Amino acid sequence: MTKVSKERLKELEESGDVMELNLGPQHPSTHGVLRLKLRLEGEVVLSCDPVIGYLHTGVEKECESRTYHQVFTLVDRLDYLSGPAEEQAFAGALERLMNIEVPERAQTIRIILLELSRIASHLLWAGTSALELNMSSVFMYSFAEREKILDLFEQVSGARMFPSLWRIGGLAKDLNSDFISHLKEFISGFQKIWKELDRLLTDNFVWCKRLQGVAVIDQEICKQYMCTGPVLRASGISYDIRKAYPYLGYENYNFDIPTHIDGDSYARYLVRMEEMLQSISIIEQAIARLKPGVVLTNDRKVALPPRKELARSMEAVIHQFKLISEGLHPPVGSVYNCVESARGELGHYVISDGTPKPYRLRVRSPSFSHVEVLKKVLRGHVISDVVVAIASVDPILGDVDR
């Protein structure tokens, strides 16, 4: 859609015929309980003021009364579409603070699950965004593929959206015997579906007209609002935590960082589509690198002993009793650990006072920046573009409010 010029905007503001409209907090197009206070003159948006807080759960404060092991079940519900990324951000912070070496097999499995989570999140984004523009076929294709990923998560962890599989020093359990075969089957089918989604959307006249030129977020705005992830890369800045600050051995994987220079909603769509292919490439490399071994550190001051040891080792029983009753005791200090989630830089800042519970947990959310940037980019657009703009930055309100 065409954006109104600054001169025309000034005329509309001086006309005096301005209407205030609340979009949300209960509206299907806001992707959560987000409220936008819009000032309109006719169909033209004069200003946009995002109002957050409707999904505030106090998770950061709640973590202060939970042991480090219990925190995992809380943090993966913040960005509820990227639970593995939340768990990796927190686990990685503790592992850095305590100098814990994660077994190689556990690192590789973590990468597989993180990239599957990224693909699932982008599929949900593509499906819901297309549905808002009455493209139901894309919605059905996307959700059918996402369902297969959720089945894979259920197979390995027993849960579909909140795996809670991460542990400090590794993973709760290893992959079952047929997981890799099912994963390869998914990869083979997904590449065909990706081509179909690309055919349905990339050159679609309606899709292009509705997205191109809408909510342009250039490099200066990205820096001003600290945007990351696909929003940043769609403006032409090639920045990805997996490349800039590698973790879990990402530096040993060959993958590209998709970028585009237009900075509009269509560019963000292209970045996410290309990211899904890069994630598939990373998963295939991880499968090839997967070697037999343990998936949890053998440091008994950090990790519970295997169940089979409890029946024959008094030392294992003592370690389990002390770890459960007294908890984990990280050294006094603080650490910031960030990962590349589906939405951008997700960071956990953990302060330890030496007790079994965090003194403070602060979450750096990518969605918060992307919601705030809407006030900058929606001015001058027509109201029908607001829905497209919200979808294009892909906010998760559980990640915003915390």
UniProtKB/Swiss-Prot annotation:
Task: Specify the protein's topology with respect to the membrane.
Answer: Peripheral membrane protein
Pfam families (UniProt xref): Complex1_49kDa
What reaction does this catalyse?
Answer: a quinone + NADH + 5 H(+)(in) = a quinol + NAD(+) + 4 H(+)(out)
What are the annotated GO cellular component locations?
Answer: plasma membrane
Q: What is its EC number?
A: 7.1.1.-
Q: Does the keyword Membrane apply?
A: yes
Q: Subcellular localization, per the record? A: Cell inner membrane
Q: What is its main location?
A: membrane
Q: Which UniProt keywords apply?
A: Cell inner membrane, Cell membrane, Membrane, NAD, Quinone, Translocase, Transport, Ubiquinone
On assembly, the entry states:
NDH-1 is composed of 14 different subunits. Subunits NuoB, C, D, E, F, and G constitute the peripheral sector of the complex.
NCBIfam families documented for this protein: NuoD (TIGR01962), PRK06075.1 (NF004739)
The function of this protein is: NDH-1 shuttles electrons from NADH, via FMN and iron-sulfur (Fe-S) centers, to quinones in the respiratory chain. The immediate electron acceptor for the enzyme in this species is believed to be ubiquinone. Couples the redox reaction to proton translocation (for every two electrons transferred, four hydrogen ions are translocated across the cytoplasmic membrane), and thus conserves the redox energy in a proton gradient.
Family indicated by similarity: Belongs to the complex I 49 kDa subunit family.
Q: What is this protein called?
A: NADH-quinone oxidoreductase subunit D
